[in-house]
Regions:
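Well-ordered alpha/beta subsegment
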Residues: 116, 120-124, 190-209
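A structural signal for short, well-ordered beta-strand segments
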Residues: 93-95, 135, 147-149, 160-164, ...
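A residue-level signal for conserved active-site and pocket-lining positions in enzyme catalytic cores
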Residues: 33, 48, 186, 197, ...
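Short, conserved beta-strand/beta-arch hydrophobic-aromatic motifs that form part
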Residues: 59-66, 73, 144-164, 168
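N-terminal lobe of the biotin/lipoate ligase/transferase fold
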Residues: 4-144
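Short conserved catalytic/interaction loops centered on acidic-Pro-aromatic/His motifs
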Residues: 128-130, 158, 169-174
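A hydrophobic, small-residue-rich beta->alpha segment in the mid-to-C-terminal subdomain
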Residues: 165-192, 198
């Protein structure tokens, strides 16, 4: 885990801790987020990871029900949005951020996060667009990135997922996030080094939190 002080704003020294979790079960990560929030940290945390195959059901979902015995399992969660899919080859970023120390209103967190991810994609000359109504990033009307967050006790949790080279057959067995669209992978459009891409994203997220 990398941990260091990177900025000062509003006369408050704010630490951002980046943590690489690798391939990890969804429920294990969720429990770790809850434990961190209960500790009321003074710092921001951004976790980079991939999940074992799992469908997660958001609070807006009305059609799909939880079924932990299926393969992959369907797990009910408390994030915003509907149902999405996580699997290896999808880069996930969880934001456990102290809402009192953001350099922008908490209501702008989803918008700022999508714009930040979009700026990283723009460096690859990839044509894409942000959909504010159904939050995410789209390439040729196919969804490549999804976002869903929640705030509890003045902390955000959950976050952003970006399909790099994941299992689209399973993903597209549902309507991604309840939309009549297909999911897509970045590697279908651009040649991308995952480690460099993650580094670019984390640098952009750092700037997002220090403006």
């Amino acid at each position: 885990m990398a941990s260091y002080v990177i900025c000062q704003f509003r006369k408050i020294m704010t630490e951002i801790r980046f943590k690489e979790l690798g391939l990890i079960e969804y429920t294990e990560t969720y429990d770790a987020m809850m434990q961190l929030i209960e500790s009321q940290p003074s710092f921001h945390s951004i976790w980079s990871l991939e999940h074992y195959p799992v469908f997660t059901i958001g609070i807006s979902e009305k059609e799909i029900i939880e079924d932990k015995l299926k393969t992959p399992p369907f797990i009910k969660t408390d994030r915003g949005g509907k149902t999405t899919f996580h699997a290896p080859g999808q880069q996930v970023f969880y934001f456990i951020l102290n809402m009192k120390k953001l350099p922008f209103p908490p209501t702008e967190l989803t918008k700022k996060s999508l714009e930040t991810a979009s700026s990283a994609l723009a460096s690859y000359d990839l044509k894409h667009n942000i959909n504010a109504r159904d939050p995410g990033i789209f390439i040729e009307k196919q969804k490549v990135a999804s976002i869903g967050m929640r705030i509890k006790k003045n902390y955000s949790y959950h976050g952003l997922s970006i399909n790099v080279e994941t299992d689209l057959d399973t993903f597209n067995s549902i309507k991604p996030c309840g939309l009549n669209v297909q999911a897509c992978n970045l590697k279908d459009y651009i040649d991308i080094n995952v480690d460099n891409f993650k580094k670019d994203l984390l640098n952009n997220f750092q700037r997002m939190l220090t403006k």
